[in-house]
């Protein structure tokens, strides 16, 4: 029976880096992890709450707008540096957005003596990120677009990015069928067993009227 491992954890320390950079005493380690989780959830909730709503916009701009690829947290003695990597930082560029976010985050920080420093970093090639493609597919499926058409459109978007291979899998009650199944589409190379191959991965749940669908995306970026 095949054993499947998370592609990101499998390559941690080689082609993938940690998203949290700090040290703590063993007795305080769990508190640091909980604090990181609260900070990340607070940022994602803020983005989701303030995301622009409108049904007349283009699918590409709506589905990919303000999608966070990952959040880096660096802790020093008196400062917590939070670096938000985002596809299209239109929302966070608004006047007063960073200050409002800092106030929300300060409530989640354990120590009142530590100050927050938030930095926004735009992703150079958004459609190279599996999180953004997963959000795009979710937007398509929620608008009753066929799942096969949604997967093909997502792969077409990756033509703008410099990647070597991609695989998209959707599992669940596809097209409202009573029996759940999985469908996948693949293009290019995807060497999952090669550790030096830089592969980005994303697992994303989508809530539809027929139930929850699971989307998994593997992207082969380059080989180091």
Curated annotation (Swiss-Prot):
Gene Ontology CC annotations of this record? chloroplast; cytosolic small ribosomal subunit
Name the SUPFAM superfamilies on file: Prokaryotic type KH domain (KH-domain type II) (SSF54814), Ribosomal protein S3 C-terminal domain (SSF54821)
Domain KH type-2 stretches: 43-124
Q: Which UniProt keywords apply?
A: Chloroplast, Plastid, Ribonucleoprotein, Ribosomal protein, RNA-binding, rRNA-binding
Q: Mostly located where?
A: plastid
Q: Which domain of life is it from?
A: Eukaryota
Gene3D superfamilies from the UniProt entry: 3.30.300.20, Ribosomal protein S3, C-terminal domain
Sorted alphabetically, the Gene Ontology BP terms of this entry are: translation
Record's keyword annotation contains rRNA-binding: yes
Q: Which InterPro entries match?
A: KH_dom-like_a/b, KH_sf_prok-type, Ribosomal_S3_C_sf, Ribosomal_uS3_bac-typ, Ribosomal_uS3_C, Ribosomal_uS3_CS
**GO molecular function per UniProt:** rRNA binding; structural constituent of ribosome
This protein's assembly is summarised as:
Part of the 30S ribosomal subunit.
Q: Which HAMAP family match?
A: Ribosomal_uS3_B
The entry assigns this protein to a family as follows: Belongs to the universal ribosomal protein uS3 family.
Write down what this protein is called.
Small ribosomal subunit protein uS3c
Which organism's genome codes for this protein? Sorghum bicolor
């Amino acid at each position: 029976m095949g054993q499947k491992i998370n592609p990101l954890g499998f390559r941690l320390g080689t082609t993938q880096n940690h998203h949290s950079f700090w040290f703590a005493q063993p007795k305080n380690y769990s508190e640091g992890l909980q604090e990181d989780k609260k900070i990340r959830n607070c940022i994602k909730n803020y983005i989701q709450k303030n995301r622009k709503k409108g049904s007349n916009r283009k699918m590409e701009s709506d589905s990919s707008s303000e999608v966070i690829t990952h959040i880096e947290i660096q802790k020093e003695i008196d400062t917590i540096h939070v670096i938000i990597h985002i596809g299209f930082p239109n929302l966070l560029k608004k006047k007063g957005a960073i200050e409002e976010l800092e106030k929300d985050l300060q409530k989640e920080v354990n120590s009142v003596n530590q100050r927050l420093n938030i930095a926004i970093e735009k992703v150079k090639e958004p459609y190279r990120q599996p999180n953004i493609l997963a959000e795009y597919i979710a937007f398509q499926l929620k608008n009753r677009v066929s799942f096969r058409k949604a997967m093909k459109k997502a792969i077409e978007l990756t033509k703008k990015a410099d990647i070597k291979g991609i695989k998209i899998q959707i599992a669940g009650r596809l097209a409202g069928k009573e029996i759940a199944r999985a469908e996948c589409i693949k293009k290019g190379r995807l060497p999952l067993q090669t550790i030096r191959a830089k592969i980005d991965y994303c697992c994303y749940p989508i809530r539809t009227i027929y139930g929850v669908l699971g989307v998994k995306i593997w992207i082969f970026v380059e080989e180091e």
